[in-house]
Amino acid sequence: MDPNGEHSPLGFLPCYKPPGATSRDLVNRAQRRLRGEFGLRKLKVGHTGTLDPLAEGLVLLAIGSAARLTPWVLQHGKRYLADFRLGVSSESGDLESELVTQTDVKLPTAAEIEQVLKDFHGVVEQTPPAHSAIKVDGERAHKRARRGEDFEMPKRRILIDSVKLISYEPPMMRLDVRCGSGTYLRTLGMDVAAACGCAAVMTKLIRNEVGRFTLDDTLDCAFMFDDDDREKMSSEPMVKYLRPAIEGLTHMPAMNLDRQQIGMLQAGIRISGTPEAPSEPLPEAWIGCIDQVDTFDRNTDVLDCIGVDRSDGSSGPWGELVAILRPHGKLWHPLRVFPTTESITLRG
């Protein structure tokens, strides 16, 4: 609850992050604005996956208690459009560092690129770039890289659902990528180029999808980073773009709950029941690979389900989120519980 005794909001806010802005800055600015819209002194806001400053596109913000759902939202795949320039390299793998042109290098044909892309599917081993937010020995890698330190980045396994060559006008290559959390698109493009016998840097990156959320759903937050537009757009309420928290969990099995079960869960008591199949399940191939990927925890993958209240039909087609449930023998344990009175009316 907020300090005035009102219930806090709960949901996901799909935002468009402009290039040049950090995801943390987007969170901070959205938090200040939403506190004003809700009349709250405190409001938890987080993101469900960062975007590099030079990238743009969809950043899904978790509002209020929805931040507790991040491990399950991260199970969703993401979709990107990524542009690369072949035949050049940079220390950071993008335009943030000075470009070095390769000499005496023959650029690949489109057919050669498409042949190489066949090897980048399913579980793939990847070495993240040194200019990244990954911590190495307790410190962000990009800070150590900018100090000129020599260190080794740990390899990790990532999941690529599909990667397609959308256009190729040498030296520019555009890829359409569907992948799991933890994938570095800079590294993917550099690895594809290396397999073709050349170097590459990423020149543009757009995140188009996170699960069922798309760029078309987003609030364009560019105005929050432009002093000239900030006042002009101040009448546009951010809350109208807030989506029910359950929309980030439609890939999970769902159990319909009655009033007695809801009361038991809110008291921390395990319940019995049988969940329904997910309304928007993850692809079978995705589920088969998901526990092989370093960024996923099998305990929070396909084993859990959501408990929902569909008693009055006022919470949209999925119902109102009550709890995240984890199997415990023949019963279901309330891992995360959300009092139904905590939810606010959101657009369906």
Curated annotation (Swiss-Prot):
Keyword tRNA processing set for record: yes
Keywords, alphabetical: Isomerase, tRNA processing
Keyword tRNA processing in record: yes
InterPro entries named among the record's database cross-references: PsdUridine_synth_cat_dom_sf, PsdUridine_synth_N, tRNA_psdUridine_synth_TruB
Any matching Pfam family: TruB_N
GO MF annotations, alphabetized: pseudouridine synthase activity; RNA binding; tRNA pseudouridine(55) synthase activity
Protein name: tRNA pseudouridine synthase B
Gene: truB
